A protein has these predicted regions:
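Auxiliary, metal-adjacent structural segments of Zn-dependent hydrolase domains
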Residues: 61-151, 155-160
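Post-HExxH zinc-binding segment in Zn-dependent metallohydrolases
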Residues: 66, 176-233
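Active-site recognition of the HExxH zinc-binding catalytic motif
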Residues: 70, 164-181, 206-207, 378
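Acidic helix-start/capping segments at beta-turn-to-alpha-helix junctions
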Residues: 79-99, 190-193, 224-233, 283-286
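Short, compositionally biased low-complexity segments enriched in polar/charged residues
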Residues: 111-146, 312-370, 380, 385-388, ...
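Short pre-active-site segment immediately N-terminal to the catalytic Zn-binding motif
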Residues: 151-167, 194-198
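Pan-zinc metallopeptidase signature
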Residues: 238-368
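C-terminal soluble interaction/assembly domains
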Residues: 356-475, 479-481
């Protein structure tokens, strides 16, 4: 769910991702590890500094030179002149705030943050707006603004690193003149997963072009480099104040368009070169699944269209819908990872074939209801998902009573409402925060057989209420609602 202010609309707001300092550092170090650059060429995250007058005078000339080189690398010709500007940290911060306000209204950003809370992706009450402003102000190295058709670079970036920033962002400028990148990304709306896939094409292709720029004169290209495992790189993203306090999901979401997109772009480049990658703009990927598994893009796999019935009548007039969208394979991998770990999450999410989720909020109490329907690749995969996601739900909700389990139905009660998981065929529905009667109404609207009845039992003995021990990690990774 691109990030300026995010990776996924579900969690944040979509805007073309500005180039971050840590991306420069990780990319150069990764290339150095591959034996392509010398240690002197591998940059580290630069510290804040003011540009000298001489550097300002050289900036435009350097940008023009790099722009010509990127045109030659990508095969995209410059059609109209491009504005180029150095920006101070205060100017970058003002730009971030302006873009955030233009992209989504406060109520929309509130809804997106609450939805991320509902999935357990960010802690309850996490100030997402402030965090993203601080992070982007701290980390932006440069950006291309499609609306203004202007390239900005941070004036504190050392001269040695400016050309690396230029290579990435000026690739976007060239792409915009040929493919109108902002309109191209937004054409995927309202499908957040498809929009993130398009963001990943933009960032991944610009990463590939930046690497080819770094490799000029070596006789090598991005096609010659080893595959990237983004999960390894994410572990290096804790060196700055804002990143240190970032929830794991946000770190993953920040890096995915760059390095997930780079893996996809490199796969496309190998047989066809840059003309083949440009053709992706005419036939964009349909989901993050196609970014994660480029062979599925090549085969033309189309995600299943998954729907959910209206919940308004079942919930009542005092509930407001906050979000109604898709998570995609990337989103579900992140949800599962919070509670099951990276390896299990990756395997389970790979069986994704389509999904839909809705989030509702009660006006007075601010309680939430989360309903998610997931289509798996087969009934066997649905059964596997049922077994492991029921475990995830137990980890997510520390205090629970009346736990009830059958082969395809699982439920328990929490202080904030019932939690239900039901699988029928290859479809699974997860329902958190409402009563059994509302869940039964949903099942009826789906045309599913009635779920098993929970046996009547005496009032629970408080001493036997299952309570998961609370730790600092569990409180931040799996907030209760």
């Amino acid at each position: 769910m691109g990030i300026c202010y995010s990776a996924n609309n579900m969690a944040l707001s979509t805007k073309r991702v500005p180039l971050h300092i840590w991306v420069l550092a990780l990319t150069a170090l990764w290339i150095a590890d591959a034996g392509t650059l010398t240690a002197q060429q591998a940059t580290t995250a630069p510290t804040s500094r003011a540009a000298t007058k001489a550097e300002n005078a050289d900036f435009t000339a350097a940008a023009d030179e790099v722009l010509q080189q990127m045109s030659e690398i990508t095969g995209l010709k410059l059609r109209t002149p491009l504005k180029k500007t150095l920006r101070s940290r205060d100017e970058i911060r003002a730009y971030v705030i302006q873009q955030m306000d233009e992209e989504k209204k406060p109520a929309e950003r509130y809804a997106a943050a609450r939805s991320a809370e509902a999935f357990g992706l960010i802690p309850k009450g996490f100030d997402l707006d402030s965090f993203m402003i601080d992070l982007l102000t701290e980390q932006i190295a440069g950006l291309y603004d499609p609306k203004a058709r202007e390239f900005y670079i941070a004036d504190w970036i050392p001269v040695a690193d400016q050309r690396m920033v230029m290579a990435h962002e000026l690739t976007h400028a060239l792409q915009d003149q040929h493919f109108q990148i902002e309109a191209w990304v937004k054409a995927a709306r309202p499908n957040d997963d498809a929009e993130l896939a398009r963001e990943s094409v933009l960032e991944g292709s610009a990463m590939a072009a930046m690497i080819d720029y770094l490799l000029l004169g070596t006789g090598r290209s991005v096609q010659d480099l080893p595959d990237i495992d983004p999960t390894i790189l994410v572990g290096d993203l804790g060196s700055t104040p804002a990143l240190k306090r970032a929830p794991p999901f946000l770190k993953d979401a920040l890096i995915f368009p760059y390095f997930g997109g780079l893996t996809f772009s490199a796969t496309i480049l190998k047989p066809a070169g840059w003309s083949g990658l440009s053709a992706v703009f005419a036939k964009p990927p349909l989901s993050t699944q196609q970014i994660l598994h480029p062979a599925l893009y090549g085969s033309g796999k189309v995600p299943a269209q998954v729907t959910l019935p209206s919940m308004e009548k079942l919930l009542g007039a005092d509930w407001t819908k906050l979000e109604d969208n898709l998570m995609g394979e990337f989103g579900w991998k992140e949800v599962l990872k919070q509670f099951l770990g990276e390896d299990r999450a990756k395997t389970l999410a790979a069986a994704w074939d389509g999904d839909r989720y809705v989030v509702y909020e009660q006006k007075q109490t601010k309680r939430m209801v989360l309903v998610a329907r997931l289509r798996l690749a087969s009934e066997d995969q649905a059964a596997r998902f049922f077994g492991q996601y029921s475990e995830a739900l137990e980890k997510k909700h520390g205090t629970r009573t009346n736990l009830f389990r059958r082969p395809n139905f699982f439920s328990f009660d929490t202080p904030d409402g019932g939690v239900f998981l039901r699988c029928v065929g290859a479809d699974c529905v997860s329902f958190e925060g409402a009563s059994r009667a509302v869940f039964d109404g949903l099942g009826k609207a789906l045309g599913w057989p009635a779920a098993p009845d929970v046996p009547k039992e005496p009032a629970a003995d408080p001493a036997k209420v299952a309570t998961q021990p609370k730790t600092a990690d569990s409180l931040s990774a799996a907030p209760r609602f």
